């Protein structure tokens, strides 16, 4: 850790040394301006060192960076960490699977109808720059309202060949199946009918929960 820079692609180094349940956070690189962070931690349950990535309000473990032995983990970090941080601040087309390209997600014409702000939410991730997370899923687009810890995301899962929607309301996951679709055309129809009402519902429930 003595070799780690204080700043890296706009991310600020933070020494954590904190315990949450069976997870020991060692250190993090944080960019609050873009709501991204990367945390190196040890998971007691699995006896493994891991890397946790936060994008907006979504957190996931990077499966390519897991190791039971510290020296192996350090090797993985040296090989991957720079690219991980770089790709968080600048979209890398190489992270997009050929399956995503074949579904025409990045060139989806409907994205021109997704406004930068909608019902108090801000477009945080857009279809032209999808984000790979875990379990074969990509974030297609993401509307965020950080002021109430709430969002709405459309995902695509490559294994199921399915689009689906998921919200967070006061940082608590909330799913329904209204947006489940096999094709972009089907998803587009459902978004036209249900996107605005869903965002309104999320805001209303977030507001009520904070009373």
Predicted regions and their residues:
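Intrinsically disordered, low-complexity regulatory segments enriched in Ser/Thr/Pro
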Residues: 35-76, 144-186
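Negatively charged, low-complexity tracts enriched in Asp/Glu with abundant Ser/Thr
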Residues: 1-29, 83-149
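Mixed-charge, Lys/Arg-enriched low-complexity segments
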Residues: 59-105, 169-211
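Structural alpha-beta junctions
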Residues: 10, 161, 196-197
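Low-complexity, repetitive regions of proteins mediating host interaction that are extracellular
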Residues: 3-4, 34, 58-62, 68, ...
């Amino acid at each position: 850790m003595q070799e780690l820079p204080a700043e890296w692609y706009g991310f600020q180094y933070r020494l954590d040394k904190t315990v949450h349940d069976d997870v020991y956070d060692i250190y993090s690189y944080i960019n609050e301006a873009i709501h991204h962070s990367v945390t190196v931690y040890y998971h007691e349950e699995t006896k493994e060192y891991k890397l946790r990535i936060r994008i907006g309000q979504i957190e996931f473990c990077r499966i390519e960076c897991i190791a039971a032995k510290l020296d192996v983990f350090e090797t993985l970090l040296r090989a991957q960490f720079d690219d991980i941080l770089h790709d968080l601040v600048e979209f890398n087309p190489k992270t997009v699977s050929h399956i995503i390209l074949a579904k025409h997600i990045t060139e989806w014409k409907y994205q021109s109808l997704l406004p930068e702000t909608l019902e108090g939410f801000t477009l945080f991730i857009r279809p032209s720059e999808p984000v790979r997370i875990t379990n074969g899923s990509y974030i297609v687009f993401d509307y965020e309202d950080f002021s109430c810890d709430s969002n709405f995301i459309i995902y695509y899962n490559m294994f199921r060949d399915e689009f689906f929607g998921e919200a967070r309301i006061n940082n608590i996951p909330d799913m329904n199946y209204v947006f489940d679709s096999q094709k972009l055309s089907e998803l587009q129809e459902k978004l036209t009918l249900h996107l605005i009402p869903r965002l309104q519902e999320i805001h209303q429930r977030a507001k009520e929960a904070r009373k």
